[in-house]
Amino acid sequence: APSIAFAALRYKFKANQISLRILAMADKQEKPQNVFDFDYSKDGGDRPPQEFYDRIKEKFSEERDLRLGFRPPGTDSYTSDLSGELAKYAEDPHSHEVEDREPLHDAVEVLFIGGGFSALLTSARLREKGVESIRIVERGADVGGTWYWNRYPGVACDVVAYDYLPLLDETGYVPSRHYAGGEEIYEYCKKIAERFDLYDLAVFGTTVTSTVWDEESETWVVKTDRGDEMRARFVICANGTLSKPKLAKIDGIEKFAGHSFHTSRWDYEYTGAELENLADKRVAIIGTGASAVQAIPELAKAAKELYVFQRTPSSIDVRDDWETDPEWAATLEPGWQARRRQRAIEGPQVPDAVKARRAAMSKEEKVQRQENANIDAMMRIHKRIDEVVEDASTAESLKPWYMLMCKRPCFHNEYLPSFNRANVTLVDTNGEGVKEITEAGPKFDGVQYEVDLLIYATGFEVQQTGIYNHIIGESGLDLNVKYENGIRTLLGIHSQGYPNLFIMGGYQAFFAFNLTDVLNSQGEHIAECIDFARKNAIHSLDCTNEAEEAWVQEVISHRGKTTRNRDCTPGYYNFEGAENRRQDGNYNGTMKDYLTHMSSIREHMSDNFLFTRR
């Protein structure tokens, strides 16, 4: 096989053409071309020979194996048990905003564990159904979920705001930018809570410790770390799957004599509101994932010195951002977001001729064309790095060698240029990661990096079940114990043996890059189920074994069609490289398919659920 360099030479003309198109699109504020814009059914005669793609795939595998050689597959190289000497990394810097209160021993109709978009969306739908008794139990000091916790400099959403921010039709709000910043999103979350009167019964600074089904009263007993013992007819797990900060297991974390924190617990008291206190500080940040990509440009501008410790680079694409045109906003008619969402679900119209070509392809050819288009997109990202980053060695280190979507793709216009600054140093650990921290700071490959501030951009624990407390259902069975032999749900929302319990954002549900689309659909479904129970004098509903098994098999039938996740470099999308059961993942049909299943299940409630009446 030819070397990558030789193959890339033959690829140069094609890459230049793509790059020029991308720049033109960016100038016109149009969405840049990416892998999802490629039609893999086209002949692709202007693409490189197949041997080029095969060699790139070999390189991807080499990079994956290199990283797995440094650590075991799975999450053992991280810890989310932030207690003892690590407790400070989980402390809420805004906890002073929580008022003291007496323990609660009351009852509500609907109780949410978590106060992010899952709870806000579903509560809005429940209000529309006339449900008045709604309580949000949130460990933070306010609603907002991830946008409450993540307030690091530069934080913003990487999904178009007109799609990501939910309930725009209902609130009449129009985002200020194409991509909304974190502060705007957080304020919008509070606006939703006010609009739907969700603060009245909410409790903050409170962590649920157990949720137990009382078979005699057929209600859930919810206990918290504040001494509460509340009862609820319906409980909705809305705590999110990326809400618990984690740290890499690095020897000596506790030895560091300087200041340190996790990105999701940003200490503005130390850095200053505008990072002005960092002007004379040497700063290190460990991690180059989505949070780091947004924070690093701001740190680069403010810090005296910045060391960026990288294990695996993120893919960085163009961020086509702009302020919302007020004239365009004034033309929006009621229902505009719902129509926009429906168009996205329906997808583009595919000509019959293209459908016919796709239908005639073998599975192997389809996979190959998809992979080749994916590699085309990644090589364009590589070319952009070469164009932006001045130092050739740094540019090579910043190139991601994996398929797009192996890791969360990032979009930023200032991240790559940050490495052209004289005060910024990239410390590429080449897949190994930082292994030691001393009193002075990180130490890698025999080099001691003396710093004043150490920031951990090491991400969050991925909770497969969508729950964090002990949920005890019928017959005293802990939900986590039930899942030991594989996750079992209906739609990723219901689990047999746990009546009136709903799980949001967990596995076996559909996954979309715009997560709020999924949460909105789940919220509508949950509100419909609760409304059905209330209107039909049903006290509790629980999915049947048959319905649950049918959904598990549906999930399995859509998994394992490719080896993409297995072939990826370790990351939270593939359980850090660990082998996982075929049912322990997302539903890989389409969003439209998922909604169709939801609708069908609601149309046949008596076939899919067991009811009790009191």
Feature locations, PLM:
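C-terminal, flexible cofactor-proximal segment of oxidoreductases
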Residues: 28-49, 53, 58, 64, ...
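A conserved short coil-to-beta-strand element within the FAD-binding core of flavoproteins
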Residues: 204-218, 426-441
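Rossmann-like dinucleotide-binding core of oxidoreductases
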Residues: 100-107, 111-112, 117-143, 150, ...
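Feature captures the FAD/FMN-dependent oxidoreductase FAD-binding
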Residues: 176-242
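Extreme N-terminal leader/targeting segments of oxidoreductases
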Residues: 20-22, 26-109, 187, 246-267
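Glycine-rich dinucleotide-binding loop and its adjacent helix/turn
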Residues: 76, 80-99, 165-175, 181-185, ...
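Core beta-strand elements of the Rossmann-like FAD/NAD(P) dinucleotide-binding domain
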Residues: 225-234, 279, 445-453
